[in-house]
């Protein structure tokens, strides 16, 4: 039994009268779907502006956002999509469900983001998209990846599910000349329980218009006679969710500023614990939105890491084991897996294998707490690591 107990952390999701008033506003407008109301339209305009994008399209969840973006980028049977081997499974399954082959590549041992050299080595004539995931809100090396994209002609699709409000060398996600997707699932940095968005930079208006049709059963905005222009599905976000997301967006920047300040302290405290290595940074990623507080205990086996997480949870911390390497999940091999064995992929993804075994993360609400709570958090982690 761990002698120390965690302090109270701020609740998540957070809400106040802004969400309440938004829900009433959506209710009273009398139209609760996007084709009849204005909450989704307003949220899309506000979210696009906040991220420097030309357009935003709100959808049902982050996985659908990825599927939709990949589809309008031409991903399908006979194509390949490069993804990080260390990521949530949706990054790979979104491509696999479209009939493509997902090619996992290794990540950097310090930042947990795509290794550009590994990406360059994985590009083939079949590669249709390169998908960087901005892990825990730390943006991937967009300079190196943009150069690979320019040299090969393979476009980037940013999986920004963790990176609401993040920046790379002063540029927002929508200003980096590539399509990006976001998630608004319950634990994310802004949430309506579920939801997602695809943002399109200048020059991608045609893909945006196609995506709108695809996400609405092929129907144009003004269709009243069931003229389905192209094949599609129903991925439309509802008006209630959009009203909540508008309120969530309004407080995003303030929360990011708090998390950033708190991470500076917590990472220093974690780094002082023998055997603990906090997630590294990149000075070019000059605004990290801090979706997770991640750290490694290099050399720890997966079994011992899992026991460590159990002790942290028992003490009251919102702690989690890191993502499993996607090639070590059964789901990865069901559809669109490369013609390689698990061991073959693991040999070229040593960092992923290590991180997925020895990494722990804390939910971002920890970073909304005060300094005393962070000191207490570090003490609990130090005690648990000493017994790991």
Curated annotation (Swiss-Prot):
<dbReference type="GO" id="GO:0000271">
    <property type="term" value="P:polysaccharide biosynthetic process"/>
</dbReference>
<keyword id="KW-0456">Lyase</keyword>
<feature type="modified residue" description="N6-(pyridoxal phosphate)lysine">
    <location>
        <position position="188"/>
    </location>
</feature>
<dbReference type="GO" id="GO:0017000">
    <property type="term" value="P:antibiotic biosynthetic process"/>
</dbReference>
<comment type="function">
    <text>Catalyzes the dehydration and aromatization of 5-amino-5-deoxy-3-dehydroshikimate (aminoDHS) to 3-amino-5-hydroxybenzoate (AHBA), a compound that then serves as the starter unit for the assembly of a polyketide during the biosynthesis of rifamycin B and other ansamycin antibiotics. Cannot utilize 5-deoxy-5-amino-3-dehydroquinate (aminoDHQ), 5-deoxy-5-aminoshikimate (aminoSA), quinate, 3-dehydroquinate, or 3-dehydroshikimate (DHS) as substrate.</text>
</comment>
<keyword id="KW-0808">Transferase</keyword>
<dbReference type="Pfam" id="PF01041">
    <property type="entry name" value="DegT_DnrJ_EryC1"/>
</dbReference>
<protein>
    <recommendedName>
        <fullName>3-amino-5-hydroxybenzoate synthase</fullName>
        <ecNumber>4.2.1.144</ecNumber>
        <ecNumber>2.6.1.-</ecNumber>
    </recommendedName>
</protein>
<dbReference type="GO" id="GO:0008483">
    <property type="term" value="F:transaminase activity"/>
</dbReference>
<dbReference type="InterPro" id="IPR015421">
    <property type="entry name" value="PyrdxlP-dep_Trfase_major"/>
</dbReference>
<dbReference type="InterPro" id="IPR015424">
    <property type="entry name" value="PyrdxlP-dep_Trfase"/>
</dbReference>
<comment type="similarity">
    <text>Belongs to the degT/dnrJ/eryC1 family.</text>
</comment>
<dbReference type="InterPro" id="IPR015422">
    <property type="entry name" value="PyrdxlP-dep_Trfase_small"/>
</dbReference>
<comment type="subunit">
    <text>Homodimer. Can interact with RifL.</text>
</comment>
<comment type="pathway">
    <text>Antibiotic biosynthesis; rifamycin B biosynthesis.</text>
</comment>
<dbReference type="GO" id="GO:0016829">
    <property type="term" value="F:lyase activity"/>
</dbReference>
<dbReference type="GO" id="GO:0030170">
    <property type="term" value="F:pyridoxal phosphate binding"/>
</dbReference>
<keyword id="KW-0663">Pyridoxal phosphate</keyword>
<comment type="function">
    <text>In a complex with RifL, RifK may have a second function in the AHBA pathway, acting as a transaminase introducing the nitrogen into the first pathway intermediate, UDP-3-keto-D-glucose, to give UDP-kanosamine. Appears to use glutamine as the nitrogen donor; NH(4)(+) or asparagine are 30% less effective as nitrogen donors and neither glutamate nor aspartate show activity.</text>
</comment>
<keyword id="KW-0045">Antibiotic biosynthesis</keyword>
<dbReference type="InterPro" id="IPR000653">
    <property type="entry name" value="DegT/StrS_aminotransferase"/>
</dbReference>
């Amino acid at each position: 039994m761990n002698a120390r107990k965690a302090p109270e952390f701020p609740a998540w999701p957070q809400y106040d009268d802004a969400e309440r008033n938004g829900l009433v506003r959506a209710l009273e407008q009398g139209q609760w779907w996007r084709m009849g109301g204005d909450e989704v339209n307003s949220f899309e305009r506000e979210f696009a502006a906040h991220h420097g994008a030309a357009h935003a399209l709100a959808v049902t969840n982050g996985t659908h956002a990825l599927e939709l973006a990949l589809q309008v980028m031409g991903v399908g049977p006979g194509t390949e999509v490069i993804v990080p081997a260390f990521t949530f499974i949706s990054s790979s399954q979104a491509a696999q469900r479209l009939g493509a082959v997902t090619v996992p590549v290794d990540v950097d041992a310090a930042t947990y983001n795509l290794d550009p050299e590994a990406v360059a080595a994985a590009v083939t004539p079949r590669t249709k998209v390169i998908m960087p995931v901005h892990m825990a809100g730390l943006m991937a090396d967009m300079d190196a990846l943009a150069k690979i994209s320019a040299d090969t002609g393979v476009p980037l699709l940013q999986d920004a599910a963790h990176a609401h409000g993040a920046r790379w060398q002063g540029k927002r996600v929508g200003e980096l000349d590539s399509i990006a997707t976001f998630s608004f699932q319950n634990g994310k940095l802004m949430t309506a329980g579920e939801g997602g968005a695809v943002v399109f930079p200048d020059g991608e208006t045609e893909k945006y218009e196609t995506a709108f049709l695809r996400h609405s059963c092929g129907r144009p905005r003004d269709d009243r006679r069931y003229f389905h222009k192209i094949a599609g599905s129903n991925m439309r976000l509802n008006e209630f969710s959009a009203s909540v997301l508008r309120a969530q967006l309004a407080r995003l920047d303030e929360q990011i500023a708090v998390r950033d300040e708190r991470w500076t302290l917590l990472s220093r405290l974690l780094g002082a614990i023998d055997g603990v290595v906090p997630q590294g940074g990149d000075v070019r990623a000059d605004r990290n939105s801090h979706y997770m507080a991640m750290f490694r205990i290099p050399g720890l086996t997966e079994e011992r890491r899992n026991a460590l997480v159990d002790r942290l949870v028992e003490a009251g911390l919102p702690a989690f084991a890191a993502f499993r390497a996607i090639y070590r999940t059964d789901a990865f091999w069901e559809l669109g897996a490369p013609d390689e064995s698990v061991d073959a992929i693991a040999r070229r993804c040593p960092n992923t294998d290590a991180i997925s075994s020895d990494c722990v993360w804390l939910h971002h609400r920890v970073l909304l707490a005060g300094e005393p709570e962070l000191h207490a958090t570090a003490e609990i982690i130090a005690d648990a690591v000493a017994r790991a």
